């Protein structure tokens, strides 16, 4: 081990690497936080997004989703519903709260889905009891580009999904594969 560092609180996301930065989500002082470290283990920056919604389990976290980058911008999503876009040096460009905007999270366990990127959008799948949907937001502005509801009935306790969608090319077009009941 070349170096290790403590996070402000339990974070369960997978770190992402972009050039000389290691980027991770974590709660910090009751807030949703995105932070970056250099290869030397020193913190480069830390940006607060909004109030944290803590994990249900003692080992859980409101920061389970992993951040993602297209090499131009960064994006992060949290259990609180906060979805945000950032510059590569951590400056907050925009944020929206999906739970305030659409519906409260009804997942039995803590959130597990992370955002994915298409050519133009940052996309999230929210699959739980009640209104479930796939929503796409403009990467630069955070404006809602489209939202598709899950339009079929699901058995009780089988309507939750914790999986991250996958963007694929299908007959020369982008398609989004979503796992869920």
Give residue spans per PLM region.
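Noncatalytic, solvent-exposed loop/strand surfaces
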Residues: 1-181
């Amino acid at each position: 081990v070349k170096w290790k560092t403590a996070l402000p609180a339990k974070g369960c996301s997978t770190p992402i690497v972009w050039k000389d930065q290691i980027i991770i989500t974590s709660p910090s002082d009751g807030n949703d936080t995105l932070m970056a470290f250099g290869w030397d283990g020193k913190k480069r920056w830390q940006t607060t997004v909004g109030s944290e919604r803590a994990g249900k389990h003692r080992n859980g976290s409101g920061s389970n989703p992993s951040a993602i980058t297209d090499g131009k911008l960064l994006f992060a999503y949290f259990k609180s519903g906060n979805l945000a876009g950032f510059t590569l040096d951590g400056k907050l460009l925009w944020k929206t709260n999906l739970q305030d905007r659409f519906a409260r999270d009804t997942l039995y366990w803590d959130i597990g889905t992370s955002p994915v990127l298409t050519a133009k959008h940052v996309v999230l799948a929210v699959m739980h009891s009640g209104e479930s949907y796939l929503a796409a937001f403009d990467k630069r502005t955070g404006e809602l580009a489209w939202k598709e509801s899950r339009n079929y009935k699901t058995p009780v306790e089988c309507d939750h999904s914790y999986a991250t969608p996958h963007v694929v090319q299908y007959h020369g077009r982008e398609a989004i594969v979503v796992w869920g009941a």
